[in-house]
Amino acid sequence: MHDQEAANGGETATNPISSLDVPTPPATTIPTLSSPAPLLRPAIPGARSAGARTPRLGLAIPPSPNVKPVGGAPGRPPLPTLHLATPMGSSVTPHEQPPGRPSIVTQQGQSASGGSESSAAHSRSGSFGPLDGRTSNPTSAGSQYSALSFASHFGIGSTRPQGTPDPASAVGSIYSERSDGGAGMDKDGNLKGLENFDKLTIDKARTADVEDLDVEGWKIASMEKRIVELGGLGEGAGGAVTRCKLTGGKTVFALKVITANPDPDVKKQIMRELDFNIQCASEHICRYYGAFEDPSTATISIAMEFCEGGSLDSIYKEVKRLGGRTGEKVLGKIAEGVLRGLTYLNSKKIIHRDIKPSNILLCRNGDVKLCDFGVSGDFGTKGEANTFIGTSYYMAPERITGQSYTITSDVWSTGVTLLEVAQHRFPFPADGTEMAPRAGLIDLLTYIVRQPIPKLKDEPSAQISWSENFKYFIECCLEKDPQRRASPWRMLEHPWMVDMKSKRVNMTRYLAQVWGWDDKGEAKPAE
């Protein structure tokens, strides 16, 4: 009974799905994948639907300032004087700016290197705004990395142009020439002017915590052994993750330690992960606290939010071990969080490119967050990318075949992830059989591209049944044609998603039952 409750987010039922009040639509009302768009609604009777009409574009084009008067009309008045607010905060126009560099004033608790929310909304290639999968900025640094990654994958040598800085220097202002008393490091790696951790504590009038530290602050905490490890959280791609806390601090955080690789492509990948984490500030994205480099051990450490509920991968495997099954309403809340996270990333012109169960984290209260942007990529002028990186098993067909792809490739990965959690097994091959032991990655990728997509099926022997809308949602995610596959924000309008958003699910109780937490938040002793 305990296992059945855990599988249904706190609902007691013999069938984890039967308690849902989700009416199954008639078979004739379920759309088919042969329709032009994989989703949604039929045309409204009587409405004007003669096809898409080209919108009229009204442009306000200012006339030339050199145009001559017509018919004796008076000449054009002189143009107004343009007064610019300079980036340094002065209201003086550029030609009136007094000589010398104005002083930079930083507020307490804010990094001089730009750790504010306003700076987090910008990338290396320009400012961002909500986009529909399209961009107008020049090719980004992520696209440059794509070429390097693709070349190295096929053994094509590439060298960095002379004078190009090493991406590892972007960890922070390590080499500094500041003369304002700030912290810096000389060319030999010796610290100059770094305040100690106790001085930071005095300045804050309290013990410094993770929100108070900038790049130099994290380096001080590391050098003075102020980072206390509380336990391991597992191994990620390229590094170990531990649960930590600062000495005297209250916030528990996850610290991902990555061993630096001399390969410049790997360094660029690590620095891209840091860059993306700095940009992102969303309730559906794992929060980033900071990073620092340890030259003595050749490692880069990344401090991020600790999500106590664990990864979706560990959760569904624990439910499977308990003999239960994750309910449809719980999967609905997880799908909603993932799609909202992807929609936010798209507004920042970011493709995650590594959606899988282990990169979807749950907080103690059930909030769903995306993490690990180690292979995320920002896309260029057409909103597309063409690199072959990421977790291959969850890749969309267009990525496997080396074609360009968009944010909809993450929708495919979301469908594979949900199908795996619902069925308690990786969904390929579709018939549920295991591939031959000697079958490798190429065989599996070939199968994904050429064979029919897997479908979510009922399991009468286990008394498991799924709604028709959920089955169709999975089909929409696993649409092989990337032109017909819906975007994350469109999938949020899917009938199943609309229905699931109206359901109330006690995700806190669900996680407590999965992990055996008691009312005090502690793990129950094993029986």
Swiss-Prot record:
Species of provenance: Pyricularia oryzae (strain 70-15 / ATCC MYA-4617 / FGSC 8958) (Rice blast fungus)
Does the UniProt entry include the keyword Transferase? yes
Q: Which terms in the GO cellular component ontology are assigned?
A: cytoplasm; division septum
Q: Which reaction does it catalyse?
A: L-seryl-[protein] + ATP = O-phospho-L-seryl-[protein] + ADP + H(+); L-threonyl-[protein] + ATP = O-phospho-L-threonyl-[protein] + ADP + H(+)
Q: Which UniProt keywords apply?
A: ATP-binding, Kinase, Nucleotide-binding, Transferase, Virulence
- Compositional bias (Polar residues) spans? 134-143
* Ranges of biased composition (kind: Low complexity): 107-129
Q: One matching Pfam family, short form?
A: Pkinase
Q: Which GO terms describe its biological process?
A: cell integrity MAPK cascade; MAPK cascade; positive regulation of appressorium formation; positive regulation of calcium-mediated signaling
Q: Which parts of the sequence are annotated with region: Disordered?
A: 1-143, 156-189
The family classification in the record reads: Belongs to the protein kinase superfamily. STE Ser/Thr protein kinase family. MAP kinase kinase subfamily.
This chain belongs to the protein called Mitogen-activated protein kinase kinae MKK2
How does the annotation summarize its subunit structure? Interacts with the adapter protein MST50.
Q: Does the keyword Transmembrane helix apply?
A: no
List ligand-binding residues for ATP. 233-241, 256
One function term, GO molecular function aspect: MAP kinase kinase activity
Composition skew (Basic and acidic residues), residue ranges: 177-189
Q: Residues in domain Protein kinase? A: 227-497
What is the documented function of this protein?
Mitogen-activated protein kinase kinase; part of the MCK1-MKK2-MPS1 MAP kinase (MAPK) signal transduction cascade that is essential for appressorium formation, penetration and invasive growth. Beside its role in pathogenesis, the MPS1 cascade is active in conidiation and cellular stress responses. Targets downstream of the the MPS1-MAPK pathway include transcription factors MIG1 and SWI6, as well as GSK1 and MPG1.
EC no.?
Answer: 2.7.11.24
InterPro entries, per the entry? Kinase-like_dom_sf, MAP_kinase_kinase, Prot_kinase_dom, Protein_kinase_ATP_BS, Ser/Thr_kinase_AS
